[in-house]
Amino acid sequence: LDLLDGSNKPVVAAIHGTALGGGLETALCCHYRLAVGTAKFGLPEVHLGLLPGAGGTQRLPRAVGVEKALSMVTSGSPIGAADALASGLIDSIVEGDLRSEALAYAIEKASSSVSHPKLRDTDERLQDATDNPEIFNNVRKMIARKTRGFMAPENNIRCIEAAVSMPFDEGLKFENKLFMELMMGPQSKAQQYFFFAERQAAKVDGIGKDTQEIPINKVGVIGGGLMGGGIAMNMANVGIPVTIIETSQEALDRGLGTIRKNYENTASKGRISQEDVETRCGLIGG
């Protein structure tokens, strides 16, 4: 990555999709960044119990300012191209062909006598935090309830603090130290397991995209309590008739009454019409 921002020729990042994590860190090492209007940018490592480990915490605040950088690394949420342009993360949004415009941009910069900007040498966007160091504690207070007990958000903040208080190369060493602490610790392993397990749970092994759906014409639900009633309502909401099986007529009537009450409450809030209430209740019997 040092070869990118150390190049004496202009290095232009042409971003056409998502620049997340290492992708954004690579783009930050380039002298210029162009993107299409649908591009997304972010450093989501905090969701994996980590922090950006390739200079992201040191370059990002130099590009977008400390406050914006803190928001991005502690939330892990991506931002759009318009936001990236307004914050200084990218230099331009390309409307035409990205490749040809990026090449033209690089040729234009190569023909210029102006030196190519390196974020490692830029400190102007750090000044706000230098003048107001409380910005870091304010962020800590703001995210405290949501992130209590998690190490990654705090270490991300400490790295942004290092970007302000340390020379760039020292900040990189500090970032690497905290990154290794997180990577070798139990929290990141647990968060990474959770992250990938959650996505794997949405997939069913052996069922391909070409698998034909089986039409559902009617559903039977055993029990009309809290869970059974909720299942019945979900089916009725999409127009599928439901038969609830209960141990007694009394239990069945109670379950059907609760379902009607729930639909009536939803209608009173304007989310569905009274006609919808009757239609959906009419689909549920026992």
Residue ranges and their predicted role:
Residues L1-H16, G56-Q58, A63, Q191-I214, ...:
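An acidic, glycine-rich surface segment that forms the CoA-thioester-binding/catalytic face
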Residues L1-S115:
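Conserved catalytic cores of soluble enzyme domains
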Residues S7, A63, S75, C159, ...:
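Generic, well-ordered alpha-helical scaffold segments in large soluble proteins
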Residues I107, L178-K189:
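Long amphipathic alpha-helix in the N-terminal Rossmann-like dinucleotide-binding domain
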Residues A202-N262:
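NAD(P)+-binding Rossmann beta1-loop-alpha1 motif at the extreme N-terminus of oxidoreductases
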Residues S248-G286:
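Conserved N-terminal Rossmann-fold NAD(P) cofactor-binding segment
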